[in-house]
Design a protein with these regions (language model features):
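N-terminal beta1-alpha1 cap of cysteine-dependent amidohydrolase-like domains
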Residues: 1-108, 118-119, 126, 130-160, ...
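Conserved G/P- and acidic residue-centered "switch" motifs that form tight phosphate/ATP-binding loops
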Residues: 111
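The feature captures the ABC ATPase H-loop/switch
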Residues: 114
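Active-site-proximal beta-strand elements of phosphoester/diester hydrolases
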Residues: 207-211
Length: 230
């Protein structure tokens, strides 16, 4: 009997009933399990010096959604509408990204994940789309859906199997300046970057999206990640 590959999934800390707990949205677990993977929660309060050990035990890395990335990480001052930040999580995920890339592990970056990946590689973020990009489509409405356009021939297009998709949208931040090591491969109608991947095609499999595929019926991204992990 073959063994299902294990992947690391970042699990943030939350205050629940007055106690600090490590949490993981079960939608990630279900989506990864349905793709034939074993999700292993990696607490984002993990010391940055433990990142290498964390990724040594797995075949891939999933960067999950959550808080805003601290503006200090990309040389900006806090915007008045900046949301909650967790500098400890930032440090842990930056170290996990570096360790995973050093081992050429596949990375699937979701929502905050695309943002921290962009920051890790030298990019910057819009701290609040509504105020910094007036007229943008509603990106922070949990019930909203909007179309995205996917670049032909991109890894994302090959993974999704389509050049267009309708996605959910639960973010108020987004990529401003794209990191030198990434290229944009999906956009909302307002031009906001919704997908990115390595600019160098020889790099390991990395797909980053601004939406939450774990909450959609379509599982192509997780299936593509599983193929890369295998």
């Amino acid at each position: 009997m073959s063994t299902a590959p294990a992947v690391a999934v970042t699990a943030p800390r939350r205050l629940v009933d007055g106690r600090e707990r490590v949490t993981l949205n079960t939608a990630y677990v279900r989506a990864l399990e349905s793709a034939g993977l074993v999700p292993l929660a990696v607490p984002t309060m993990l010391g940055a010096d433990r990142a290498g050990a964390a990724v040594a035990a797995v075949r891939g890395l999933v960067l999950t959604g959550g808080e805003d990335v601290a503006p200090a990480r990309y040389g900006a001052v806090p915007h008045p509408r900046l949301g909650d930040i967790d500098p400890v999580r930032d440090a842990a995920e930056l170290a996990l990204i570096a360790a995973a890339r050093a081992r050429r592990l596949p990375i699937l970056a979701i929502c905050r994940g695309i943002q921290i990946l962009n920051v890790a590689l030298g990019g910057t973020l819009y701290q609040d789309l509504d105020s910094e990009r007036p007229g943008s489509v509603p990106h922070s409405d949990a019930t909203a859906r909007h179309p995205v356009r996917v670049e032909a021939g991109s890894l994302l297009e090959r993974t999704l199997g389509t050049r267009s998709a309708t996605v959910n949208s639960r973010h108020h931040q987004a990529i401003r300046d794209l990191a030198p090591g990434l290229r944009a491969v999906a956009w909302a109608d307002d031009g906001v970057i919704e997908g990115a991947e390595p600019a160098d095609a020889s790099e390991a499999w990395i797909v980053a999206v601004q939406w939450h595929p774990e909450d959609l019926a379509e599982r192509a991204l997780f299936d593509g990640f599983a193929r890369a992990v295998a």
